[in-house]
């Protein structure tokens, strides 16, 4: 009986020590040195500001577009060349979202979207369930003017604990994010930007 009460008491104490809170997604994240949400926001934000203000895209041929002369973009990938498992799709999604909101760009669907589009067109044309005058067909998609793609790299350095450092370990990570915008017709690089981050973590003899 006493043992059961002790277990219940311990469970109550442990439960009281845990909590879940909502927080500001834009708050600076400093829990670990690993790539995190703040890094994603900073890198994407810097690229978007640079691309929107670029003068190199003003000379693109806009013939055949009708009244809407905005640049049509295909969002390529960001290659992860770091040692970390980083979902770079989150970076490209963030960039595409902010560029769309700027009102200066149009985007065509990437491969994942093309699969869904193809499936829907085949359904409309072959199922017999869709009105003929509303059926969509292949061959009417917009052609992208440019493609955006890039790479994320990192350089990591570690210094182990020592008597001189008081048992403190130090880790330094440098991130380099490059992105370029290429004219699909000519393969000319119209814009290129680089964003950098450096993070340092010091860990005491008893860990984080």
Q: What residue spans do the PLM features occupy?
A:
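C-terminal/domain-edge helix-coil "capping" segments
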Residues: 17-68, 138-145, 152-161, 166-208
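N-terminal segment of the mature soluble domain
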Residues: 50-54, 58-59, 68-129, 140-142, ...
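Short beta-strand segments at enzyme active-site cores
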Residues: 108, 148-149
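Structural motif corresponding to alpha-helix initiation and N-cap regions
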Residues: 132-133
């Amino acid at each position: 009986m006493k043992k059961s009460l002790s277990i219940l008491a311990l469970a109550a104490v442990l439960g009281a020590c845990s909590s879940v809170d909502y927080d500001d997604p834009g708050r600076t994240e400093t829990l670990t040195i690993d790539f995190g949400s703040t890094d994603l926001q900073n890198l994407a934000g810097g690229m978007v500001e640079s691309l929107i203000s670029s003068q190199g895209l003003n000379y693109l041929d806009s013939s055949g577009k009708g009244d809407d002369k905005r640049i049509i973009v295909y969002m390529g990938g960001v290659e992860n060349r770091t040692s970390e498992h980083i979902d770079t799709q989150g970076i490209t999604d963030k960039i595409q979202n902010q560029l769309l909101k700027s009102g200066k760009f149009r985007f065509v669907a990437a491969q994942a979207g093309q699969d869904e589009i193809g499936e829907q067109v085949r359904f409309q044309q072959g199922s017999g369930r869709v009105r003929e005058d509303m059926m969509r067909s292949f061959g009417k998609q917009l052609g992208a003017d440019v493609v955006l793609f890039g790479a994320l790299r990192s350089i990591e350095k570690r210094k182990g604990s020592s008597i001189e450092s008081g048992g403190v370990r130090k880790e330094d990570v440098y991130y380099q994010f490059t992105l370029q915008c290429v004219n699909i017709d000519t393969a000319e690089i119209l814009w290129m930007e680089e964003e950098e981050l450096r993070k340092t973590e010091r860990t005491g003899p008893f860990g984080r």
